[in-house]
Curated annotation (Swiss-Prot):
Name of the protein in question: Melanoma-associated antigen B18
InterPro entries in alphabetical order: MAGE, MAGE_N, MAGE_WH1, MAGE_WH2, MHD_dom
Assembly and oligomerization: Interacts with LNX1.
Domain named MAGE: residues: 107-306
Comp. bias intervals (Basic and acidic residues): 88-102
Gene3D superfamilies: MAGE homology domain, winged helix WH1 motif, MAGE homology domain, winged helix WH2 motif
Principal location listed in the UniProt entry: cytoplasm
Bias (Basic residues) ranges: 1-17
Record-linked Pfam families: MAGE, MAGE_N
Amino acid sequence: MPRGQKSKLRAREKRHQARCENQDLGATQATVAEGESPSPAYLLFGDRPQNLPAAETPSIPEALQGAPSTTNAIAPVSCSSNEGASSQDEKSLGSSREAEGWKEDPLNKKVVSLVHFLLQKYETKEPITKGDMIKFVIRKDKCHFNEILKRASEHMELALGVDLKEVDPIRHYYAFFSKLDLTYDETTSDEEKIPKTGLLMIALGVIFLNGNRAPEEAVWEIMNMMGVYADRKHFLYGDPRKVMTKDLVQLKYLEYQQVPNSDPPRYEFLWGPRAHAETSKMKVLEFVAKIHDTVPSAFPSCYEEALRDEEQRTQARAAARAHTAAMANARSRTTSSSFSHAK
């Protein structure tokens, strides 16, 4: 290709890119102007489309329609919050308006499609490329690719506890990474390919915010708000009651026990030893804060408790390292002494 034509082609590509960036900025500004926050909403999926071709755009499930309404999703009971209190009617009205605004945003239909596309890729462990996302989902809205991918990634993070990251910036390949140090997903069978870290993190958050022990009904109340019901099979989590009261208990991430002296018997959830070992109160609080679109310090008492927990963990790690070093030195001296006596 002649040099002049190459220059014109590059100039045309730059103009197209600038036009796309301006459109993305305009879309974001319009969203804010309408009163809808562009920050992540907690996306729990409703009914999964049956045999959905990747190229189709599904209708927005009921559970998605209220996606922005997250401020009361995991309401602190034991932990006081700095956020201003308002009446329940005002909150409900605001949530309804947010839900309507979310549905009216045309980009969110693409977000829903992309989330389902990513779930299919996760289940089949097929490579994820920018080209495929544009070809099968984004299509004519490729100018908004970055914004759509950002929203979909945030929903995947909060719902499933996984991060979507670009691993090959040249060929634009993407891959999923576990957000936390939890190893629960490594223990699942081949049939259970969807991670349940998000469900576990919700439960751990409810427990922590309820003074480190949460009544069973309080946990299910939160789950219900997010479209997860104990007596209804969920297409991501399967049998939620079994996952919560058996699977996660057997794996020692949760403890499920009868409330002492309760008659009729009532049950409660606590953190299991594996949860204490593999995550921390600060990580869980950060997860909860992200759901609320705020910062951990917005929950002062829980934040202080999480800071104390972090300090204790730091001291424990330092003590463990010191003990390991002392043992190594002792073995070294013993070996050296034995060698000297042998001479």
